[in-house]
A protein has these predicted regions:
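Active-site neighborhoods of metal-dependent hydrolases
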Residues: 1-187
Length: 187
């Protein structure tokens, strides 16, 4: 158990198991200019937009021409053509027809159970969240752990929190979450 780990390493000077970290999701950065375009994998509440870019000759600036509608007729033909024919005909990669909301690093049950176990042992829980779906999963787990272990001395913190859905903002003070923002990403 977590308490056993704490006791096992308790005699090591300057080493204390006081905080456990969980990666709820991955990164927001994708590479839409690669072939095929690579989407971010941060867990989002809504599907990622799939841009088609253009670049004027002699100018380094890349601009968005349009976004792909995955429900459009050309995307219905996604499996009918090979990749090169699809790109030539439709001017975008067929993988851009695939809808994605990103992924969690672990399933939700693990996130909730791990958070509850740490909090129940009085250990601080630090969750890495980028997308708004990941942030919501983390604070849902915090709320659940707090209800299960109301006398725990463990705290909750979140790193990055690049995207927070407005509906989740009022919950933050009730849960008492500490934040570790990455300030270089603010602007």
């Amino acid at each position: 158990t977590i308490k056993d780990l704490q006791r096992k390493y308790n005699d090591i000077p300057n080493f204390h198991l006081t905080t456990g970290k969980i990666f709820v999701d991955g990164v927001l950065e994708g590479d839409p200019l690669s072939t095929p375009p690579m989407l971010p994998n941060a867990a989002s509440l809504s599907d990622y937009l799939q841009p088609v870019f253009y670049q004027k000759e002699g100018i380094d600036l890349v601009q968005i021409e349009r976004y792909i509608d995955p429900r459009a007729p050309e995307c219905k033909k996604y499996f009918d053509l090979d990749t090169d024919k699809f790109i030539k005909l439709h001017k975008f990669h067929p993988n851009q027809c695939i809808e994605s909301k990103g992924v969690f690093e672990h399933d939700l049950e693990f996130i909730e159970n791990y958070t509850a176990a740490l909090h129940g042992a009085g250990i601080n829980v630090h969750s890495h969240t980028i997308g708004d779906r990941a942030f919501r999963a983390a604070i849902d787990a915090f709320e659940s752990a707090k209800k299960m272990h109301p006398t725990s001395q463990g705290n909750f913190s979140v790193s990055h929190a690049q995207v927070i859905h407005p509906d989740d903002k009022p919950r933050l003070s009730d849960i008492e979450i500490f934040f570790a923002f990455t300030y270089s990403w603010i602007e």
